[in-house]
Amino acid sequence: MSAYCGKYKDELIKNAAYIGTPGKGILAADESTGTIGKRLSSINVENVEENRRALRELLFCCPGALQYISGVILFEETLYQKTKDGKPFVDVLKEGGVLPGIKVDKGTIEVVGTDKETTTQGHDDLGKRCAKYYEAGARFAKWRAVLKIGPNEPSQLAIDLNAQGLARYAIICQENGLVPIVEPEILVDGPHDIDRCAYVTETVLAACYKALNEHHVLLEGTLLKPNMVTPGSDSKKVTPEVIAEYTVRTLQRTVPAAVPAVLFLSGGQSEEEATRNLNAMNKLSTKKPWSLSFSFGRALQASTLKAWAGKVENLEKARAAFLARCKANSEATLGTYKGDAAADTESLHVKDYKY
């Protein structure tokens, strides 16, 4: 197979490897205006641009936090926002050794003839947008495909459509200098057990890598953002060690060694659960040719939001909470987390979650 070997090849490989640096991970701060509005309303803060900007400044300018972060996924609005002192967020991140990334999908639409299964849209002007984002300083991108587990789901049609969609997105990104994060999220919603989740995740990942190869995507210049293999939200919980064994086995069976890093989504787990599960994976002594890290949104921000509550006087307390989560997850990428960081243990699960 001839993989992409255009002018950005070396840069893509270097940036993908950097994002996967052990001890670091991704902060997902790419919530849409509607989604961040729900977060802000949970702390009684109005969803206006200044409040959204203030929250992002709280996170990006938190002293000491960026040493644990290799990339931040931004929403388009944030790519062009500045600190209150007028410094572009992109410059703040770069100076902190963090690569800016950008969410490029345009949400999901229902696949006709299925039971509410979806595919992701946004390919039409993707090349043009990627070139513009690269110019603005972005160096990687994210595209979320969403699948669900049901009696007959995911259907082969939904799997194929989403795998092909991710592959088309990935090669367009690479042609424009952006490392594509491939995110086939299998929602945790439902009563299924962990074996069913493992089977579906293997099937979906196998389809994704087949499609990526068919589109001549340079795997060394990509990253994978999958769900952890867990029981459904309405099923009996299992230990982090069991989740680690199932998840790593699933990756071993499906993800090529050429991929530099796997950065898990938290999928509505509590802050503490997400960190403990990641830590358990990195403690496993088995074949792991990729680094295993995090690309967390809610699981990095929940306790920070609660501490901040939109008040200037709470800034220090909120930053301390954010720094603690960044450090805890950094330790989890090394398998050294001891569970001593203040964390929110409340489930962050939202049924049929939309970004």
Curated annotation (Swiss-Prot):
Pathway: Carbohydrate degradation; glycolysis; D-glyceraldehyde 3-phosphate and glycerone phosphate from D-glucose: step 4/4. Its EC number is 4.1.2.13. This is Fructose-bisphosphate aldolase, cytoplasmic isozyme. It comes from Zea mays (Maize). SUPFAM superfamilies: Aldolase. Gene3D superfamilies: Aldolase class I (3.20.20.70). One of its GO terms (biological process) is fructose 1,6-bisphosphate metabolic process. It is an enzyme of class 4 (lyase). Keywords: Cytoplasm, Glycolysis, Lyase, Schiff base. It comes from the Eukaryota. One of its GO terms (cellular component) is cytosol. It is found in: Cytoplasm. The active site is at E183 (proton acceptor), K225 (schiff-base intermediate with dihydroxyacetone-p).
